[in-house]
Amino acid sequence: SFYFLECEFTVSVQLVVMLELQHGQLGKNCSGFSRRSALKAGFLGALGLSSADLIRLRAEGKAARNNKSVILIWLDGGPSHMETYDPKPKAPKEYRGPWSDMATNVPGIRFSEMLPLQAKHADKMCVLRSVHHDNGDHFAAAHWMLTGRHGSTSKDKAQKYPSVGSCVSRAKGPNSKGMPAYVGLPAAESVYLYPGYQGAAYLGSAFNPFQLNMKQKYLAGRSTTKIQKAPVLENLQEQGARVQGRVSLLESLDQINRDIDQSGSIEALDRYQQEAVDMVLRGRARTAFDIDRESDALRDLYGRGPWGHYTLMARRLVEQGVSFVTVDMPHWDNHSKIKDALEDRLPYLDRAVAGLLEDLKQRGMLEDTLVVVMGEFGRTPKLNSGQPGIPIPGRDHWGQAMSVILAGGGLKTGQVIGATNSKAEHPVSRALKPDDVLATIYTVLGIDPQTSFLDFAGRPVPLVDHGEAIKEVL
């Protein structure tokens, strides 16, 4: 399988194969490398690959654990759980907020009245109402939710552990040849960092998400900005010609005696490089990114703004074999003007998620596609008095309770897991941590959550330390 990186709006195809530069037994030079190792190093350089990544990583070319995919809808900034999936209409006025609740299509499950479309699809969802990590720092919270571990803070923002998407890319690869494993739409981010805590950390840049459009990123749901074709896709044709030149290079090397490489690494490199050429020249991935091929009715179902646009694109990508897609839906850090702020956000989220679930169901894809909706934390249950200069109530950071949605994916849906108290302040049953959520995602994909990869120091680090898959939903 192979992976994509964007640099100055051009595509660089990163191919990861089981290839190790190591000291050979014959013909060593003064640096301890054999002719075989030198050949590998030169070969990688000629193809524009990062030998540092290839040394650090070993892509084992395994078949996918299963054919399931994940679409992560990332609500950057932290949405209010009380105005979405855990309303408390009987709480005191200063807690319950501007809206009431409403029934869903599952008796006993109620959502905010601002989510009428999703309310029709509660039977396809598992509503986790008891997730918490008790941290109100954007950076610490986002790192925890996306990696399953505490690590970064506002004073030390560097990513410490790989994201769930990068780990899936590393452990599973794409579901279909000729597609990237991990894509960010329009660009994966967390707390204004790209890819931020959705990156690969010590797994290496080969497992970062393919960032589709860094030129038009962090778009609000209500944005009427015309969504342009990503420059990275516009350059595919030019890149195709450059890759075709690399094919000629490969052909010129066909006479190399493969007996010098008993591991078969060069043959594998040829094969993966050819897959890259096929993708670029035949346009399979390019087609997957093109939502203009969809009907007007379907585009209306998702919503015509950026959030609906990229959620529909995410469906197209998993349909073609991408294993993990993250859709960025930002601007949830609403410290003031909670009513106005959420009226600008919730309808677009509601339409995009509901449209996705309906579309997946109609296409027979829902059982094999896990949809995750989450941000870095919830919001303070008690309304504040606004923020400096904006004396209109909002909600502040709250890591003590939040809601996460898991939908489809073959789960036992139509249920709520866990509960918060009458004011949505903290869990009172089945308390869950971020690593429990991530362990569930890995399990759905057929990946053992205790799978380990080496960190920068060469120590094996499991995907999750203490988290366990949520047995009630499996």
What positions do the PLM features span?
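Ligand-binding pockets and gating/stacking loops
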Residues: F4, Q14-L474
